[in-house]
Structure formats: C-alpha cells, structure tokens
Amino acid sequence: MGSTPTIILAHGFWGGAAHWGRVILALSRLGHKDLHAVELPLTSLADDAERTRKMIAQQSGPVLLVGHSYGGAVITEAGNQPNVTGLVYIAAFAPDAGESPGGITQQDLSLIHISEPTRRRGI
C-alpha cells in the first residue's frame, strides 16, 4: 500500500491560509495527518505558484494539491512537480495551458441559458 499523500491547500484570491482551518480540522479527524495551507502572497500567479512549489519541494513523499477559487489556477501552475499525485479543484479556476484566471472571467458568457425561475428571482 502506498503512503498517504501530504495535502497542500491553496486559498482563493480574497482568502488566506487561515481560511482552511475548519477543513484541516475535519481532515485531521478523518485520519489525514500531513496537512498544510500555503499562504499565497497574491502578488502574481507566478509568485503564488512559486510559493506553492517551494512548499511541495519541502515534502518527502507524494503530495495532493487542493485549490479553491483562484487557488485552482495556482495548483494548475505548480502541480507539475514529480511528487504531485493529484489536483483537487473546489469551485475553482482550472485554466488551460497558457490561460490566465482573468482570461477565463473575460470569456463571452452570452450563450449561457438562464432558466425562467432564476430570471424571476432577479438573478
């Protein structure tokens, strides 16, 4: 049986590492022991990915990356390290190679169908 991976959590743009506190507690109760929330500097995607890569490099075994919102773009950029075994996206950006989170949000959304009940609620 393989070793349990270290789990590294990357927060969203308006968050911080501390926002993962309840998730870390819940995962700990489920038996996960090696849990880390990376504090992203939020200066650029490149800087945030580099900070995450540094945390990945500090781990001796397999790593599972989890990204929420903007953190999804970060783990996409940082997740090509040899010891990364998987990427988990939670309501997150999952950009294609070379695509930025900003590019995703600027896409033409005019083709999205909004259902009638949603329109009635003013959404």
Put a short name on every predicted segment.
Residues 112-117, 121-123:
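Single conserved hydrophobic/aromatic residue that forms the stacking wall/gate
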Residues 16, 45-47, 93-106:
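A short beta-to-alpha transition loop/helix N-cap that caps and shapes the active-site region
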Residues 20, 75-78, 123:
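Hydrophobic packing residues within well-ordered alpha-helices of enzyme cores
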Residues 22-24, 51-52, 78-84, 101-106:
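Short, glycine/charged-enriched secondary-structure capping and boundary segments
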Residues 11, 68, 113:
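Histidine-centered divalent metal-coordination motifs
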Residues 2-61:
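Active-site catalytic motif of lipid deacylating hydrolases and related acyltransferases
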